[in-house]
């Protein structure tokens, strides 16, 4: 990780774009790690950017949320590029000749999943036919040995698919809580399916590593994202229940959420199982350090989602219908970061997502370890002297126009109060006819060390292009950008703003 540190220290004021790979253009119904991802890196370079921030890269479940994945370690198979598989001889031109008609504006995850699964099974069949001395075979074998999480994940997914995707708590006991001897039987029962899941993960990791190397060669750093909590329906909880506060069956006894606030009278009940921090402490946070180790292979900088949960978190009884009955419970605090530093060295490249209910104790934890927090410009214009206004921002922070959880800037301005809109116009000295570019200029001109904009703001897109609306169960995460939007004119305009403000 020393190379990352030297690059970060050398580049004082950095800017970049937030876009999840699923949102990239491409003919297979979803953005992936193929040619369009490389084209996007080229766009970043042409426009003078040095950061590409993504959402978590894991395999998603029913609501397609990257924050509710089947594993904290695995990658999203839907991001695998069929074109790159063709380049390796695992797919043919004929395989890719009859692509269904997919929307270029939003992802139909079910249709894309069905189509890509068909392609991946063809690629897997060809892979198995390769001679044993083929380098790809030895690469997969090496990957399987080095990825400590892979056996459990592959078995979990093989069983899950055989059960029609049912939650693991609904499986028969021999699958739900297998003994060592039962696992050996399951390995034989699902031998081919387990190898297929390993093949997918190896392919994802190879394609991602190649893309990351391409970006890094161009002085572009990747910012990844670690959701603090994991999904209850995950290989993590299934394989390692002792890491979590769950009963002997596997049901959580307490769950995650946040207390009532201005936006929600009953708080938010997320439902994720909570960690057994006493057990983690006994193991010197080994599982967490492995999680960071995996993430640092995928990313140069890591954002910790809901950072405040490491200081203290809202614990809600599992049978509650709202978050009202919760209470604050201490997290691992300083000790967690002391172990992190001992493992990865001083000044680990981490961003603390410090939005929401943030106390002095949370700020003290963030500042003690020198972690940059987040400042969202859309939050800056309702109050007279908001901490989010650029003149109140410290150097050691990340300034965003908005994030994946916010409306686009154009959409936000259209629905903001007249008081906020008036302040925007006066603060930015603008008529707000292209308000997202006013926000981009203000963001890039801020004192913040890092300035990041969601890709939708580059194109002045409205609320219909929003990535996620918190609290809304369906219809999220589907946004895609059209190929023709990434023009040299947009790159030149962004480059000029970037250089004007010394980024």
Positions of PLM-derived features:
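Domain-scale activation on soluble regions of proteins
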Residues: 46, 175, 479, 496, ...
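Alpha-amylase-like alpha-glycosidases and glucanotransferases acting on alpha-linked glucans and related
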Residues: 5-11, 20, 64-205, 230-452, ...
